[in-house]
Amino acid sequence: MQQIMVSGTVAFLVSIFLTPVLIRYFTNRQLGQEIREEGLQSHLRKRGTPTMGGIAIIAGIVVAYVFTNILAMIQGVGGFTVSGLLVLGLTLGLGATGFADDFIKLYMNRNLGLNKTAKLVSQLAIALIFGFLVLQFPDENGLTPASTHLSFIRDIDTIDLGFGGSVFGIIVFLIFIYVVVSAWSNAVNITDGLDGLAAGTTAFVMGAYTLITFWQFRNSCDTAVEAGCYTVRDPLDLSVLCAAGLGATLGFLWWNAAPAKIFMGDTGSLALGGLVAGISVVSRTELLMVIIGALFVIEIASVAIQIGVFKTRGKRVFKMAPIHHHFEALGWAETTVTIRFWLIAIMAVLAGVGVFYSDWLHLAEV
């Protein structure tokens, strides 16, 4: 528990103090967000607001994770693990993609940033590398960071995407990992359209997973094989990483809350999406994440529905997509939308954690 608290605190401090440095840097160089003329008129006031604040979030996560693990090694109570490093690598890889996108927008005056092909290839390569590596590095019990089984609260034994380790099965598993990584990174990216919405929602999700992974650590099959134990590798280190994600997003939210002094940009949203995706895979809770991250699911689903219906029927389901802009178009104030969406996110998190704990109670009583 001490490691988790240290990680969250360090991440918060790094993020909250580094963010204003970035605000001054980008403001002094007149590097800010471009706002589309065809968008909501109320958003035009945001033109010129500094972006790339995700740098502070990533820095907070990295510094906190590294500091906490070095401290644990000095004290002889833990250290870096394969699972944690792989998720951190996924986070940094997607963050680098987002950084390149933001850099091109700001410094090369190309409003669209990376072209779609370059972004797709980058996400695909990063996801495939992650998917391959999470099946490597077995520990002394033969447990790898992830398994080829689809998972809800734990692995579903009857659904093996790897088909017993066949070449076809591994391809199917890698495709699945790409879908998970792409979906979550794009979902967080799409949600980042209102001041504080993506940062706050991610903080709720990371808070939930800090608890979940710590519970997996306390009830790990590595320490005691009993009813309800979890076959998750390195759960304590994953909890440390989740706490870093929680602290870093809260520190950034201090400056990103309405009226935002800075945006996280693709640097932050893609990185956080990678963190969400990676944690769901290595904690073996991919389907549970759909409940806990339900607001992200709603946001990306609204875009898919809008595009699908418009292309097939020539009609729009929403006034604007993603759905948070729909409510703005109906006349809701931005802060009203954000707070109400936060409430939805909190209810989803509570529901997901409740399902997770209920499963453990049921198995523990058997």
Swiss-Prot record:
Co-factor(s): Mg(2+)
Record GO terms (molecular function): metal ion binding; phospho-N-acetylmuramoyl-pentapeptide-transferase activity; UDP-N-acetylmuramoyl-L-alanyl-D-glutamyl-meso-2,6-diaminopimelyl-D-alanyl-D-alanine:undecaprenyl-phosphate transferase activity
GO cellular component: plasma membrane
InterPro entries xrefs: Glycosyl_transferase_4, PNAcMuramoyl-5peptid_Trfase, PNAcMuramoyl-5peptid_Trfase_CS
Cysteine-cysteine disulfides: none
GO biological process terms, semicolon-separated: cell division; cell wall organization; peptidoglycan biosynthetic process; regulation of cell shape
Major localization class: membrane
Protein name: Phospho-N-acetylmuramoyl-pentapeptide-transferase
Species of origin: Corynebacterium glutamicum (strain ATCC 13032 / DSM 20300 / JCM 1318 / BCRC 11384 / CCUG 27702 / LMG 3730 / NBRC 12168 / NCIMB 10025 / NRRL B-2784 / 534)
Name of the gene: mraY
